[in-house]
Amino acid sequence: VSSLPSTGRTLAEWTAASRSDFAAAAESLRALRENLDTGSNAWISRIPAKRLEEEIRRLQKLPPSLPLYGVPFAVKDNFDAAGWPTTAGCPGFAYHPTISAPAVARLEAAGAILVGKTNLDQFATGLAGTRSPYGAVVNPFDRAYVAGGSSAGSAVAVAEGLVPLALGTDAAGSGRIPAGFNNVVGLKTTRGRCSKQGVVPACPSLDCIAVFALTADDAGVALDVIEGYDPEDPWSRSDPTTDSAPSIPKSLAIPQSTEWFGDNRAELAWLGTMARMEDMGMALHAVDFTPLFELASLLYHGPWVAERHAALGGFIEARPEAVDPVVRTIIARGREFSASDVFEARQRRQELLCEVRALFARHDALLVPTAPSHPLLSAIAGEPLEQDSRLG
């Protein structure tokens, strides 16, 4: 295993430094810019020196009491940021927005400074972080292993201690899996809670913004900044919250059985996690997760892939040579489903949700492994679709 990445500053440490000694904090930002490229392929674009100086001057005019005053952050390169190209991991798709996505704009208004846009599985289609013409994102703990995707670069940028905060997206694991593989917090926000305006869609009805941070508290601070109803986002909801679990859950549902695909380290980590939860006084209840597994199968193998085709099929059919072959194959499958297939799947989803709600009613929270295994880069190269389906 390679040397472990150093832990960076938390949000509180960055804001405290910026408030107490602005000149020194500005020098820290300049030094950060010089050291962003660690060879991990985490970045697609990084802030130029001239723009950083403009951002430092902007920061000087803002009140130091802002919650993210002086905090550097990154965003997955499917978010629009004014003055930055948006590629979604596909150079042929790239465009230059003049307006930032609301999530980006809210972070900047809270005093944060965007220092770069991060690498991803092209069009957020993948769970390994390898389907990118900008290079496969490598895991900073061991470069033989995948970083996880699709928000690979955002997770790695936080794991390497470069930024304390990064945004990604998550429809089916794209925020949580790279967080788990890189030892950082990954928060998938509630569907509709944060505006997705200015974010390249993958599966619009399921896409959610994801937050990467070093601590759960930091992820919560960021969520407080970016959440809110957006009347211009057709998927935004004015009150998307549900009843909250207790702050310290007592009853946790765990899967009755888990397939580890021969990854003994993943199994040992899971056993250790369960033991720690029990040591903390939590009761673990083995539950039949069949409804959840069927939901996952519907998402990955059912007609929801047609939604990806609806969002991106026009570009892919016009510019097939610009698209990663595996991504092209996955999204092209969306043409195979009929309208009847879609409505049948929607009905089945609602039936399964009734079973899932009953599960939640009996327990405070679910405790599950982030992924059943952590594949090598070589395994993904040999079996890209099979390995991806295991992660999902």
Q: Each PLM stretch: what is its role?
A:
Residues 2-171, 275, 280-281, 358:
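Gly/Ser-rich catalytic/binding loops embedded in alpha/beta enzyme cores
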Residues 2-5, 68-91, 249-253, 303-353, ...:
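Short helix-loop capping/hinge segments that flank enzyme active sites or metal/cofactor-binding pockets
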Residues 21-27, 57, 265-287, 313-318, ...:
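Acyltransferase
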Residues 70, 109, 163, 326, ...:
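Glycine-rich, small-residue loops and helix-cap segments
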Residues 76, 107, 219, 277, ...:
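Conserved hydrophobic/aromatic pocket- or pore-lining residues that grip, position, or stack substrates
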Residues 85-96, 263-264, 376-384:
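Glycine/threonine-rich flexible loop motifs
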Residues 129, 134, 169-197:
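Glycine/threonine-rich beta-strand-loop-alpha-helix active-site module
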Residues 188-271:
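A short helix-breaking turn/cap at a secondary-structure junction
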